[in-house]
Amino acid sequence: MKKWQLVGTTVLGASVLLGACGGNDGGSGDGKDLKGSAKGEGSSTVAPIVEKLNEKWAKDHKDAKISSGQAGTGAGFQKFIAGETDFSDASRPIKDEEKKKLEDKGIKYHEFKIAQDGVTIAVNKDNDFVKELTKSQLKDIYSGKAKTWKDVNSSWPDKKINAVSPNSSHGTYDFFEEEVMDKQDIKAEKNADTNAIVSSVTKNKEGIGYFGYNFYEQNKDKLKEVKIKDDNGKVTEPTKKTIQNGSYALSRPLFIYAKDKSLKDNKVMSEFMKFVLEDEGQAAEDAGYVASPKKTYKSQLDDLKDFLDKHQKSDKKDDKTSEDK
């Protein structure tokens, strides 16, 4: 799996080179005086955005380390639930069963939408017949019902399809399963590494795969994007405009989930999340994704500041009560 080398921290595929969970060891809480760490895990789709955020963050926060792995959205939530991380990167919304496990442990959290993405369907660049597909046709391909291109469209070649998919640890897999497969099993070659999926499609003339928009953008000289046709005959393709306004059929938000306790007790975590929202998606754009509307960041930042202000007032009240006793 690809390793993202960050300025001031390191993101690894399965683990993070920091202590057990983030902590704050002092400092005033601003800029160069801020000290401590915050730890995350999760989506490989979100990882490039975190990398860009860290490049900016580390310039003024050399003693405030942020680290996040890219083991996949599902694996990230497992560590989040187990209490091993302060935040979790996700390319899908948290599932009901994950919410229940957090609730059972008394773990409260904030959900932050940090960017927009469009799951992109791509075929080999030498494929000259697949230009658009319906969700139903994609379902036939990825369920194994359509084994050749001719099974998808009678005018296409009678050649075996080589369908490739992320594995079930990825939020992209979950998203595709829900949006395209109607939760029917995906029967395709599965890979934990998105770069390996891209490579498989580029090397196989009958290949087809799906991944985040930025992975397509980085490899569009080797791949051919497939447009999506809906039930009404409307055809959409992933562009920054269609992804941001949600008109692309496979648009989705990208998230960071942060524990309330970490936001309240770990100054590095709270300052980093304010930094993320104040960035207003520029890091996402730099990483090849699409920023959310500015009002989305402002609204979330206002909510976060209100939450932190209430916590600080509560702490001061508790301190005064202790002194009075």
Swiss-Prot record:
A lipid is attached at residue 21 (S-diacylglycerol cysteine). Residues 1-20 form the signal peptide. This is Phosphate-binding protein PstS. Transmembrane segments: none annotated. PANTHER family: PERIPLASMIC PHOSPHATE BINDING COMPONENT OF PHOSPHATE ABC TRANSPORTER, PHOSPHATE-BINDING PROTEIN PSTS. Part of the ABC transporter complex PstSACB involved in phosphate import. One of its GO terms (cellular component) is plasma membrane. A lipid is attached at residue 21 (N-palmitoyl cysteine). Keywords: Cell membrane, Lipoprotein, Membrane, Palmitate, Phosphate transport, Signal, Transport. GO terms for molecular function: phosphate ion binding. Belongs to the PstS family. The gene is pstS. InterPro entries: PBP_domain, Phos-bd, Phosphate_ABC_transporter. Disulfide bonds: none annotated. It comes from Staphylococcus epidermidis (strain ATCC 35984 / DSM 28319 / BCRC 17069 / CCUG 31568 / BM 3577 / RP62A). It is found in: Cell membrane. The complex is composed of two ATP-binding proteins (PstB), two transmembrane proteins (PstC and PstA) and a solute-binding protein (PstS). One of its GO terms (biological process) is phosphate ion transport. It is a lipid-anchor. Residues 23-46 are annotated as: Disordered. PROSITE patterns: PROKAR_LIPOPROTEIN.
